[in-house]
Curated annotation (Swiss-Prot):
Result, substituting S24L: Partial loss of hIL-17RC binding
Result, substituting V62L: Partial loss of hIL-17RC binding
Protein name per Swiss-Prot or TrEMBL: ORF8 protein
Signal peptide: 1-15
Subunit structure: Homodimer. Interacts with host IL17RA. Interacts with host IL17RC. Interacts with host MHC-I.
Keyword Cytoplasm: no
Sugar-modified residues: N78
This protein's UniProt keywords: Disulfide bond, Evasion of host immunity by viral interleukin-like protein, Glycoprotein, Host-virus interaction, Secreted, Signal, Viral immunoevasion
Sequence ranges assigned to domain SARS ORF8 Ig-like in this UniProt record: 19-121
Record-linked PROSITE patterns: SARS_ORF8_IG
GO terms, biological process: negative regulation of interferon-beta production; positive regulation of immunoglobulin mediated immune response; symbiont-mediated perturbation of host defense response; symbiont-mediated suppression of host anti-inflammatory cytokine signaling; symbiont-mediated suppression of host antigen processing and presentation of peptide antigen via MHC class I
GO cellular component, one term: extracellular region
């Protein structure tokens, strides 16, 4: 029993600490981004402005009355197409990099960020 608990913790930690996700899409076409967060985790999508891990994040979706809607920014253009499922126009973010924040908790008190790198077909 102790071994199963230990194995569960190791599996969760290993899955939770993914740093980067590489995905392929056709440039300037709508693309449903694969969520790299582990199953049963919550996710929020951002653009990280700058290269540092401590760089500010721009949220791409907002919760409105039980549904998620894309936030449109002048500097980003129409990058986010839909939030459920998370869909973007396949292009490099103008201000930085695409990041998904994964958390087991709905309030995101503990989280881990995964950078999503797009490979254009």
């Amino acid at each position: 029993m102790k071994f199963l608990v230990f194995l569960g913790i190791i599996t969760t930690v290993a899955a939770f600490h993914q740093e980067c996700s590489l995905q392929s899409c056709t440039q300037h076409q709508p693309y449903v981004v694969d969520d790299p967060c582990p199953i049963h985790f919550y996710s929020k999508w951002y653009i990280r402005v700058g290269a540092r891990k401590s760089a500010p994040l721009i949220e791409l979706c907002v919760d409105e009355a039980g549904s998620k809607s894309p936030i449109q920014y002048i500097d980003i253009g129409n990058y986010t197409v839909s939030c459920l499922p998370f869909t973007i126009n396949c292009q490099e973010p103008k201000l930085g990099s695409l990041v998904v924040r994964c958390s087991f908790y709905e309030d995101f008190l503990e989280y881990h960020d995964v950078r999503v790198v797009l490979d254009f077909i």
